[in-house]
From Swiss-Prot:
Keywords, alphabetical: Chromosome, DNA-binding, Nucleosome core, Nucleus
Keyword Metal-binding found: no
Oligomeric form and interacting partners: The nucleosome is a histone octamer containing two molecules each of H2A, H2B, H3 and H4 assembled in one H3-H4 heterotetramer and two H2A-H2B heterodimers. The octamer wraps approximately 147 bp of DNA.
Gene Ontology, cellular component aspect: nucleosome; nucleus
Source superkingdom: Eukaryota
One GO process term, biological-process aspect: nucleosome assembly
GO molecular function: DNA binding; protein heterodimerization activity; structural constituent of chromatin
Major location category of this protein: nucleus
Protein's name in the database: Histone H4-like protein type G
Organism: Homo sapiens (Human)
Amino acid sequence: MSVRGKAGKGLGKGGAKCHRKVLSDNIQGITKCTIRRLARHGGVKRILGLIYEETRRVFKVFLENVIWYAVTNTEHAKRKTVTAMAVVYVLKRQGRTL
């Protein structure tokens, strides 16, 4: 039975993970079924196969803009946490009020 001092690492104090998931291709998480479901909700009947990649590209650009403006808003307010209201203000500024 070992006694750990203050410098020892107990449970939940692990170091860096060796096998970390690569975050380079997260846009593929927007699946074909998800895009189809959104299109059906919007009233689309048939979907061309090339639409899925284009939709992912457009969605990525849209999110980059929203996140960039939300971070700028947060930095201007001298905060470090992007709040939901910051995102709401950005969408309102773009004319997409929630």
